[in-house]
Amino acid sequence: MSDMKLFSGNSVPKLAESIANKLYVNLGNASVGKFSDGEINVQINENVRGSDVFIIQSTCFPTNDNLMELVVMVDALRRASAGRITAVIPYFGYARQDRRVRSSRVPITAKVVADFFSSVGIDRVLTVDLHAEQIQGFFDVPVDNVFGSLILFEDMLKIDLKNPIVVSPDIGGVIRARAIAKLLHDTDMAIIDKRRPHINFSQVMHVIGEVFNRDCILVDDMIDTGGTLCQAAEALKKRGARRVFAYATHPIFSGNAVKNLQNSNIDEVVVCDTIPLSKIIQELPNVRTLTLSSMLAEAIRRISNEESISAMFEH
């Protein structure tokens, strides 16, 4: 499909601008704001009839505002006769609410949001490192889940690692850690065994694996309060780890994240720009950001030209 147009909400303006620059296009002209009562107000200020439209919007904090911006923009574009609408969601919020645990009386909010997107008229979704890949099955439209972790891996190769070992911060992240370990010449793995007695709190129980005098690479899909990673780093250092690096795609950094990172034993935290960092986080000396703009721009180009997305990750 030709006549590609890019639009952006207010969640990741710098990333959206960078993607547009990589594709040699200008961001579409749209007014995205609020009425005096807080309701989302959107107006598309250019012709989009028949166009292949991409909306770049993370559903990060403020989550509900950014979510509503996205769906209201989709509705405005649909009513303006856009040919195809792809939601580019670098960070997909509500992804952690993807199941009912032991039949507890809770919603599966990831499914609710997926249904919301389908019903409003989104034709396709492009996202990065979903918290659980099976969330793709919640959608009634095609979903491309690209791997920001490969950008992180490329950065790992630039660090002078001494006797590295890849560490999963919990049992659930073993598959992700194993994939990174395989890319790093089948290096060894360790696992942090933790318990989570309640939300946003975890307790490290054991370190499974030998980390003495080794550079430890903690890998995760996101950092929220940072409590898990900081506890993991402390446990690794107590067991003689030489250095501890933490790599994660999505920098949520909520709650006590700043305090946790300031007081942590992590030598460096490396994240991607799927969520904008607050000024105080940006000023932390042990936090560094990598951009996904080139990868997302290439994925958008391939979708628009009906080319394979999986081919991006076959080498």
Swiss-Prot record:
Cofactor names from the entry are: Mg(2+)
Locate the residues binding Mg(2+) 2. D170
One family from Pfam that matches here is: Pribosyl_synth
Q: Which SMART domains match?
A: Pribosyltran_N
Indicate the transmembrane segments per the record: none
Which Gene3D superfamilies does the record associate with it?
3.40.50.2020
Annotated Gene Ontology cellular component terms: cytoplasm; ribose phosphate diphosphokinase complex
Task: For this entry, list what GO says about its biological process.
Answer: 5-phosphoribose 1-diphosphate biosynthetic process; purine nucleotide biosynthetic process; ribonucleoside monophosphate biosynthetic process
Top-rank taxon of the source lineage equals: Bacteria
Which parts of the sequence bind D-ribose 5-phosphate?
A: R196, D220, D224, T225, G226, G227, T228
What reactions does this protein catalyze?
Answer: D-ribose 5-phosphate + ATP = 5-phospho-alpha-D-ribose 1-diphosphate + AMP + H(+)
Query: Which CDD domains does the annotation name?
Result: PRTases_typeI
Residues in the active site? K194
Query: What broad class describes the main subcellular location of this protein?
Result: cytoplasm
Compartments where found: Cytoplasm
SUPFAM superfamilies, sorted: PRTase-like
Q: List the disulfide bonds.
A: none
Q: PANTHER family, per this entry?
A: RIBOSE-PHOSPHATE DIPHOSPHOKINASE FAMILY MEMBER, RIBOSE-PHOSPHATE PYROPHOSPHOKINASE 1, CHLOROPLASTIC
Q: Which NCBIfam families match?
A: PRK01259.1 (NF002320), ribP_PPkin (TIGR01251)
Q: What does the UniProt function comment say about this protein?
A: Involved in the biosynthesis of the central metabolite phospho-alpha-D-ribosyl-1-pyrophosphate (PRPP) via the transfer of pyrophosphoryl group from ATP to 1-hydroxyl of ribose-5-phosphate (Rib-5-P).
Return the similarity comment. Answer: Belongs to the ribose-phosphate pyrophosphokinase family. Class I subfamily.
| Name this polypeptide is given | Ribose-phosphate pyrophosphokinase
Species annotation:
Buchnera aphidicola subsp. Baizongia pistaciae (strain Bp)
